[in-house]
């Protein structure tokens, strides 16, 4: 089976390692503790310079929910323009209304603004009230891909829903499983869902090289 693998890059080193390991693209994010927020101008610029594979920065001005104020939306539009300026390949977005439906109006504006860059709808999808309707809304908006764990904490638990989404999508949009995707379960997930694109953090923690630390500062 031939898969497309997207790996999250939270820093330049992880982006470089992912590229060397064979990742096909990077979803570029800051703040892993918040689930990923918009990377800085400098981060995007340096990643674009250093990477030959596709680069997809997330457009998410803060952690928390996906219901944004008008001022936050202005920030998102500005960040999309930066991604175009820096020659990224796509952006990753997601906005909802308070009732758990897709904010089609503002998502459409970002898709139009991003053109000719591609657009992925991120895991805001896993917070929607009606996933099958949300799928149709996102297709209407013009996104080329949805990242989802099938409305469950991890993609294996959501495999049945992911399979249903792929069936309904009928090749009109790519459904990309993410969350808990690893080398030891990707084949199982592919068989259960029919997916061919996958998203993984492939995260590991390394010790600091600092030789001095202040024991009083534990935050």
Regions found by a protein language model. Give the residues of each.
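Hydrophobic faces of well-ordered beta-strands that scaffold small-molecule active sites
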Residues: 3-7, 26-28, 47, 55-59, ...
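Catalytic cores of alpha/beta
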Residues: 10-21, 67-81, 126-141, 162-175, ...
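Active-site-proximal loop/turn and secondary-structure-junction residues that shape catalytic pockets
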Residues: 11, 30-32, 61-63, 97-99, ...
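Active-site beta->alpha loop and helix N-cap motifs at the rims of alpha/beta catalytic domains
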Residues: 12-14, 23-25, 37, 43-104, ...
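Glycine-rich phosphate-binding active-site loops on the catalytic face of alpha/beta enzymes
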Residues: 24-37, 82-98, 143-156, 193-215
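Alpha-helix-loop-beta-strand connector modules within alpha/beta enzyme cores
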Residues: 36-63, 102-124, 159-183
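C-terminal helical cap(s) of enzyme catalytic domains, especially alpha/beta-barrels
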Residues: 44, 159-168, 190-193, 207-219
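Hydrophobic, well-structured mid-protein blocks that either form specific transmembrane helices
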Residues: 87-142
């Amino acid at each position: 089976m031939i898969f497309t693998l997207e790996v999250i890059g939270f820093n330049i080193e992880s982006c470089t390692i992912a590229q060397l390991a064979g990742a096909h693209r990077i979803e570029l994010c800051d703040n892993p503790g918040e689930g990923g927020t918009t990377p800085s101008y400098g981060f995007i610029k340096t990643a674009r310079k250093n990477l030959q594979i596709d680069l997809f920065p997330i457009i998410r001005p803060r952690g928390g929910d996906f219901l944004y104020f008008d001022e936050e939306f202005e920030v998102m539009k500005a960040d999309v323009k930066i991604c175009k300026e820096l020659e990224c390949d796509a952006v990753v977005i997601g906005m909802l209304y308070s009732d758990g439906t897709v904010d089609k109006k503002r998502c459409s504006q970002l898709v139009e603004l991003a053109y000719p860059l591609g657009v992925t709808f991120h895991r805001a999808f896993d917070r929607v009230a009606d996933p099958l309707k949300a799928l149709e809304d996102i297709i209407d908006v013009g996104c080329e891909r949805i990242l989802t764990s099938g409305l469950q904490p991890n993609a294996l638990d959501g495999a049945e829903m992911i399979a249903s989404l792929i069936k309904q999508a009928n090749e009109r949009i790519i459904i990309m499983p993410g969350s808990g995707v690893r080398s030891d379960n990707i084949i199982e997930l592919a068989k259960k869902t029919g997916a061919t694109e996958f998203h993984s953090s492939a995260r590991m923690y390394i010790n600091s090289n600092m030789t001095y630390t202040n024991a009083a500062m534990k935050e």
